[in-house]
Amino acid sequence: MAVGNGVLLHIAASLMLFFHVQKLVQYLWMNSRRHRLPPGPIGWPVLGALRLLGTMPHVALANMAKKYGPVMYLKVGSCGLAVASTPEAAKAFLKTLDMNFSNRPPNAGATHLAYNAQDMVFADYGPRWKLLRKLSNIHILGGKALQGWEEVRKKELGYMLYAMAESGRHGQPVVVSEMLTYAMANMLGQVMLSKRVFGSQGSESNEFKDMVVELMTVAGYFNIGDFIPSIAWMDLQGIQGGMKRLHKKFDALLTRLLEEHTASAHERKGSPDFLDFVVANGDNSEGERLQTVNIKALLLNMFTAGTDTSSSVIEWALAELLKNPIILRRAQEEMDGVIGRDRRFLEADISKLPYLQAICKEAFRKHPSTPLNLPRIASQACEVNGHYIPKGTRLSVNIWAIGRDPSVWENPNEFNPDRFLERKNAKIDPRGNDFELIPFGAGRRICAGTRLGILLVEYILGTLVHSFVWELPSSVIELNMDESFGLALQKAVPLAAMVTPRLPLHIYSP
């Protein structure tokens, strides 16, 4: 039966009305959501808030939070960025909504440094990440695995003590970060590859240290191309070019180490190392299998995060002790009472030294190795503290700001280990469950090396404090405590100090 023109016009008009009403409802709904976005600063055209971050983004964001509150929303380029600046805000994102923020956003560091996100740090939360994490926990980073290579840590630290004692004997200052990088890289080399990466502390180990510092610095930059992908190819800041050049250096080093490891396989019969375990168990029930590129990327994670993050906290802690000699003497008195002065500091001593543990917690609080957590991204739209967070929003947790929150910490800019001996703070732990102190992050993507990081800081710092008298060189009038921003928070001026053995000299023999 034919349909009249009037009926067709009526149907068309109804469809048009429905379409416009639908669009209006959608607009009003979206507009109401926008009004519920967290507060934040108004940025510049195109760049958004990028220019507001400056050279010290963690400080700039902490200052913004004083005005806009614990959860902020910034438009950075074409991307939304949510920033959590208090323990409660961090808990909302990293615990309550942990699964929704378990992935990383695309970024130049993952692409150009981490073999296109083939590593454990930047990989999506999925089968490959789970396999890398599992192997790392079982064979190097978990509690049982750490016990298995305790003797390696003791031996390599012995080499470092000898080198430091020799420097002291010759009246030469010790550059703390160089010594720490040398020792930690060799610790990891022994357990991962069955070899010391550096035969002695010198130009080769210092070059490696410089490479690690450069990687942690450039990886922490707010790269314009990450936030305005359409112009990433222009590399306006030169960051991507620097990453590519640095990647070539690391890849050459890792390729050489892998080739040497393969050539020496016959020497490890019956004594497999971490890399042997990874190669032998590089697949899982979900069909994921590790390739050479994944192994290189994993080794890169271990050698960079495993050396730089812990060494920076130890360096900051020693600097604070030199500025606060009363705290240094009290720590040494505690150790002398428990350990004495006729043997070396051992890992088993740590649990008997509450003041040392408090010093380490205070260093984690005031000088977190990672001031802004590695970014995450919202898989779905969600709500936090009554605020709407759109899908695809990047998340930054300001760990530095949380550690200096005056509503949580009394006199937060003061280095005061006693705060962790007080009843209300005594049980606060840096392992990711107490959001007042999360130097390693929290949730599913918490740093895989949390146990190792805490152990190295406590063990190495305790050993250095127990083993030496520490003084600043006579040429240093006032210790520089300025920060240098990056993925890891470095001292702007590396700490150099004069050391004198305070134990019998035979203890320093390697």
Swiss-Prot record:
Catalytic activity: a 3',5'-unsubstituted flavanone + 2 reduced [NADPH--hemoprotein reductase] + 2 O2 = a 3',5'-dihydroxyflavanone + 2 oxidized [NADPH--hemoprotein reductase] + 2 H2O + 2 H(+)
GO molecular function: flavonoid 3',5'-hydroxylase activity; heme binding; iron ion binding
PROSITE patterns: CYTOCHROME_P450
Residues where heme binds: C447
Keywords on record: Heme, Iron, Metal-binding, Monooxygenase, NADP, Oxidoreductase
Pathway in which the depicted protein is active: Pigment biosynthesis; anthocyanin biosynthesis
Keyword Metal-binding: yes
Database matches in Pfam families: p450
Cofactor: heme
Enzyme class, broadest EC rank: oxidoreductase
Enzyme Commission number: 1.14.14.81
PANTHER family tied to this protein: CYTOCHROME P450 98A9, FLAVONOID 3'-MONOOXYGENASE
Family: Belongs to the cytochrome P450 family.
Function text: Catalyzes the 3'5'-hydroxylation of naringenin and eriodictyol to form 5,7,3,'4',5'-pentahydroxyflavanone and 3',5'-hydroxylation of dihydrokaempferol and dihydroquercetin to form dihydromyricetin.
Name used for this protein in its record: Flavonoid 3',5'-hydroxylase
Phylogenetic placement of the source organism: Eukaryota, Viridiplantae, Streptophyta, Embryophyta, Tracheophyta
